[in-house]
């Protein structure tokens, strides 16, 4: 950050830093942005532009501020569903399939890595059963996943040495579609930033299925539809 602001000062650039204290906090130590605002001040944006429906725009602000009574509004509009973990996972896969078949971009979210892995497996299995993916074609075996041509994946590490045909570096949490799995197990991916071929070393360590992700990983994405599974483990009360 110091290097960036130093360059900006040298060349007369303007640096605009944007943050939201009500979003998920950093996994590690955080608080730097709030500290900067405390010292130098900031401008607060007070209008929401991201939602299509006015009711959801207003409800999102109440939810952001911790107003639990707004859940009744979501429930009234059939946005909340409950059931067993298995029922919820089946339901979210069905909703995901309906949304994407309608041409919508959709994000599946869950609050645990285990649930995310199961959703990714179910989504891939659904696409195999529907004939969208060929399990007998080129494939890549990872530790706990198998990747096929056409699978949706995410990259999990920034690497400035790997760039798309548009010159954009490969970044953590970028979303891609597998175009080609080469004999040497390198993989060609296509995403919003272009096409790139990743070496086998990067693929085996830093590529995974991307149909579902944790809520933290999905934060900041703009999609047409979101569906989220929250798994709650109940334990008997101590006596």
Which residues make up each language-model segment?
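Conserved ATP-binding/catalytic motifs of P-loop helicase motor domains
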Residues: 1-239
